[in-house]
Each structure stands twice: as C-alpha cells, then as structure tokens.
C-alpha cells in the first residue's frame, strides 16, 4: 500500500497536450501569414522564423511528455495512446516547418491559388486539432465526448477536402506547367501541405480512440 502511494500518478499530460496543440495552431497561423505575405522577403523571413520557433517550443513539450511518461506509474489514458498522440502532434509542426523551409530552399517565386487553398485547409485542420485536444481532460462527460468526436469528424472532412484540392492541383500542374524544375518544386510543396492535413487526421483518429475507450 505504501509502495503504491509513493509511485507517481497521473502527471500533467493533458496540460502538456494543450500547450503543444497551442503551438500547432500558432505555427499554422504563422504559416498562413508566410504564404499570404510571401512576396515581401522581410515578412517571409519573419513568418518562417515564427513557424520554426513554434516547432522548437513544441519539441520541448514532446520531450517533457516522453520524460514524464517514463516516470509516471499511473497515467490518465493508455501509455501507448499518450506516446502515439504526442508524436503524431509533433509531426504536424515538423511538416509545417518542412513546407516553409522548402519554399525558401527551392526559391519559389510566388504563391498560387492551390498553395493558398491547401495552406488554408491545413491551418483549419490544425485549429480543429487544438480544439479536440482541449476536450480530452473531460471526455468522461458524455457531452464533451460527443463534441470531441464531432470535432474529429470535422478534421476528417477537411482532410477529404484537401485530398480533392490536391488531386485537382496536381492535374492542373501536369497539364499546364512546362518548366520541369517548377513542376518539381510545386509538386513537392503540394505533397507537403497535403501531408499536414493527413497527419491531423491521424491525430483525430487517435483522439477518437481515446474517447471511445474512456467515455
């Protein structure tokens, strides 16, 4: 009995999830500012740096979650769910940073409508991820569990929208772009942006699993 009392219990996992999700939303907003003001080199650099800052701050939280997971005996949800969720969330910011860096590395000259649409859908997915994560501490309450599932379904729909935009963008790119180098640049960026919404869907699926097992 005394041994059980001495073991670390629960931990502040939900608080750390919320902090990380806040950086996801922050990074997504910075990314939108980046593509909206891409023509201005100073603003482009500023907003790219903001994406990088959000990614580094989130990395520290991911490390703290994994550290806490190793020292906590009793966790609020399954240990594998905690590990899978924080790493999937971290992947979202990694992809946001990858996309912003690729634009600079490939010397993309301007943003087209397809990039703007894919960026917008990715950012909306990130915002919904933040909301879904914020509901986790109270998913034992039926109304909160229902709201979490609904939010995850919204993420799924946004990801489907991103898939459609991606297919249309790729079709147009291969029909209309004659410069092979430009085609390769844009294809890479389209794929990176669509991967963000894919990873948000992965997070949504993990959250749905947590809700179904714990509500």
Question: Each PLM stretch: what is its role?
Answer:
Residues 1-215:
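Cytosolic, long alpha-helical scaffolding segments
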């Amino acid at each position: 009995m005394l041994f059980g009392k001495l073991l670390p219990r629960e931990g502040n996992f939900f608080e750390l999830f919320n902090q990380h999700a806040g950086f996801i939303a922050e990074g997504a907003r910075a990314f939108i500012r980046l593509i909206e003001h891409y023509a201005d080199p100073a603003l482009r650099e500023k907003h790219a740096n903001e994406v990088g800052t959000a990614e580094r701050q989130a990395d520290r939280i991911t490390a703290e979650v994994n550290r806490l997971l190793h020292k906590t005996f009793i966790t609020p949800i399954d240990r594998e769910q905690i590990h899978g969720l924080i790493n999937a969330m971290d992947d979202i910011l990694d992809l946001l940073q990858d996309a912003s860096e690729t634009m600079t590395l490939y010397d993309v000259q301007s943003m087209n409508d397809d990039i703007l649409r894919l960026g917008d859908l990715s950012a909306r997915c990130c915002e919904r991820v933040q909301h879904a994560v914020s509901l986790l501490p109270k998913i034992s309450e039926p109304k909160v569990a229902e709201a979490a599932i609904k939010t995850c379904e919204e993420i799924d729909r946004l990801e489907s929208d991103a898939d459609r935009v991606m297919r249309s963008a790729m079709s147009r790119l291969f029909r209309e772009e004659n410069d092979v180098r430009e085609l390769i640049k844009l294809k890479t960026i389209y794929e990176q942006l669509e991967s963000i919404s894919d990873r948000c869907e992965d997070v949504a699926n993990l959250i749905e699993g947590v809700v179904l097992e714990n509500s």
